[in-house]
């Protein structure tokens, strides 16, 4: 029986990958940020309607009827529990799992770098991330723009004040009428316009930080106290690829629980199953999360760009089709 057993990345690319990951660890060691290790599975998971999880079942002593477990889409919830327990600034390089796309820039199992800095807001974290990107990508300093500015400059529409009909007109100009016209959820429509219309136009020469996302897309970020229309959230793009997603972290347990419950209500409206809420995280927030900012970065995509490759299979040994 013939089989494709060889890695898709060359040995030289894998050596360069290892060197870059070593450099990332050194970056955090120099800043006295502690590396941590948290579970790949959990009894609860994310409620975000746009994230899809893998799940399995444990059957063993004390669990004769089985216990459902979810593979983590991010180590965020566990890392925040460490922060609340007094860990100080922390980072992690881990495997994350998302039951979504597989292709040029996606693999269901991928390597993620996530870190949290106590006493930072999202702007100060962008400063630090810019330093890391310049180190790994050998690029210039990043450009920065608000979410509102990016939409107005690229698409000519305001994402905060434009009507659904105005957004759909822009979608039609992008050839997206079939998808956009029946869409009733504003944030889904905005994400479509961002991914197809905005992301390909920004961050071509240097990375682009986009910040102040709509408050309805806050997820686990604080609402901006100076402008409650927006959240203290940012994303990073380079050469048409989303690299990272960061927050000035929400520390209000009641507000976080309400957001999880709102997500699950929206899931039911969409015909999706509600997800089990992580009450361990809520308990950590009740105990007290220190004021901090955090970000999750896709390591495979970062290395792909650093090495001048155009497919993540070129920088991962055994991608999904041959795993």
UniProtKB/Swiss-Prot annotation:
Gene Ontology CC terms, in alphabetical order: cytosol
Catalytic activity as recorded in UniProt: D-beta-lysine + L-lysyl-[protein] + ATP = N(6)-((3R)-3,6-diaminohexanoyl)-L-lysyl-[protein] + AMP + diphosphate + H(+)
UniProt keywords, alphabetically: ATP-binding, Ligase, Nucleotide-binding
EC nos: 6.3.2.-
Entry keyword annotation includes Lipid biosynthesis: no
Biological process per Gene Ontology, one example term: lysyl-tRNA aminoacylation
Protein's name in the database: Elongation factor P--(R)-beta-lysine ligase
């Amino acid at each position: 029986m013939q089989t494709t057993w060889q890695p898709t990345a060359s040995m030289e690319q894998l050596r360069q990958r290892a060197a870059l990951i070593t450099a990332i660890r050194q970056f955090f060691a120099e800043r006295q940020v502690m590396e941590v290790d948290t579970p790949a599975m959990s009894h609860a998971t994310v409620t975000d309607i746009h994230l899809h999880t893998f799940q399995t079942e444990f059957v063993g002593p004390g669990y004769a009827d089985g216990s459902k477990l979810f593979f983590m889409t991010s180590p965020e919830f566990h890392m925040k529990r460490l922060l609340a327990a007094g860990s100080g600034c922390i980072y992690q390089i881990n495997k994350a799992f998302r039951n979504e796309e597989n292709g040029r820039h996606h693999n269901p199992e991928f390597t993620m770098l996530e870190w949290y800095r106590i006493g930072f807001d999202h702007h100060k974290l962008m400063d630090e991330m810019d330093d890391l990107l310049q180190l790994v990508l050998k690029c210039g300093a990043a450009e920065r723009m608000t979410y509102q500015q990016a939409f107005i400059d690229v698409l000519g529409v305001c994402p905060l004040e434009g009507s659904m009909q105005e957004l759909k007109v822009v979608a039609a100009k992008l050839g997206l009428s079939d998808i956009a016209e029946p869409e009733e959820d504003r944030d889904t429509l905005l994400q479509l316009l961002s991914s197809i219309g905005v992301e390909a136009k920004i961050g071509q020469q240097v990375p682009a930080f986009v910040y102040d996302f709509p408050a309805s897309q806050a997820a686990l970020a604080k609402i901006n106290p100076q402008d409650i229309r927006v959240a203290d959230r940012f994303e990073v793009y380079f050469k048409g690829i989303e690299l990272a997603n960061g927050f000035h972290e929400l520390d209000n347990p009641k507000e976080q629980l309400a957001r999880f419950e709102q997500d699950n209500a929206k899931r039911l409206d969409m015909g999706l199953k509600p997800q089990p809420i992580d009450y361990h995280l809520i308990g950590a927030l009740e105990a007290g999360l220190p004021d901090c900012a955090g970000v999750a970065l896709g390591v495979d995509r970062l290395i792909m760009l650093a090495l001048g490759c155009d497919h993540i299979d070129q920088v991962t040994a055994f991608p999904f089709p041959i795993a």
